[in-house]
Amino acid sequence: MTLRRSFGFAVAGIAAAGATAAICFGDALGLVRSPAKADDSIVSARFDAPAHPIEVLQGARPWLTPVPDGPKALRGKVVVVNFWTYSCINSLRALPYLRAWSERYGSKGLDVIGVHAPEFGFEKNPANVRLATSQLRVAYPNLQDNDYTVWRAFANQGWPGIYFIDAKGKVRGYRLGEGRYDEGERLIRTLLAEAGHDVSGVPLAPIEGTGVEAQADWADLGSPEAYIGYDKAAGFASPGGFRSDAANNYAPAARLSLNQWDLAGSWKVGGEYALLDSGPGTIRFRFHARDVHLVLGGAADGKPVRFRVTIDGSAPGAGHGVDVDAAGWGEVREDRLYQLVRQSGAIADRTVAVEFSRPGVRAYVFTFG
């Protein structure tokens, strides 16, 4: 799940410090102590880098977007490896920086490599990942890591997990979670200079994400990630609780407290998602955030599923997200993250409701920003 935790930008031989990060945590763990100097202090980090990371990448399969001249061409290059998954909001908000680094330094000896390690079942489908990389303008090479082979080799722990490898093939720094991108870019420049590349003519210009990729409003973010499937669900408030793996007619709660949610209509709640089983249905969440996202899967018949978003019972108007209009209408066409709400002005506790017009839609997780 997404948490705000203090994880440093750990760097071998280069200054590092602790920072607040937003992370989608995974299950694979590796733990050693990796000292890094920061103002004459030692920063310890949960990290176990592979001794030969380039060899790990060279042996990985399949490449959805191949490395020009093949994986062997990575040897002798400065490489940034990004573990991501395309429905994770934390991964999406990191993309503007990775794109910019690839564009700025690709001709100076840098290769950015994406390692797509799926969280949900639909993210294992190569066609879905290819569509997502096209829609998200991820032009740098990407490999698909459905069985987490590369993830485990790097002892990665969450999305995004960003690793900085020097031209000699050594992991020199890593970042678990969002943030500290300025330090990441400075490290890239240092590693390129060490390898004999002149980056003095490349300006350190600001990088700004837009739309769903815009940085979160951390100061007013009071809602955590909330899974809908019973494996990780918390805050479910419909009377009677879940009826697991069976269709059930759910009723809305009389009142939702902050960070509670409910269902209305006939839903089948599984471990990973809730499936609208018949008729129209609604899901609600009481939130405190600027942005509201919901990861949704389309109907099995491939036809779009229309939905309508309301905030405290009214159309979102100017507070609509990129995937709905001012009246609140949107369509589920692909399995992905949908931005429902982007507010401006004062942020307060509010209730978002999403009503789906017909069955077949799958709801996975609410995320916020």
Model-predicted regions and their roles:
Residues 68-92, 98, 112:
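Short active-site neighborhood of thiol/selenol oxidoreductases, capturing the structured segment around
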Residues 92-136, 144-150, 305-307:
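Structural microenvironment flanking redox-active thiols in thiol-disulfide oxidoreductases
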Residues 4-62, 182-369:
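Non-globular targeting/processing and membrane-anchoring segments
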Residues 79-82, 111-115, 141-144, 164:
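Structural recognition of the beta-strand scaffold that forms the well-ordered cores
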Residues 134-138, 144-187, 341-345:
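Thiol/disulfide oxidoreductase modules built on the thioredoxin-like
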Residues 56-79, 102-105:
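A short beta-strand-turn-helix
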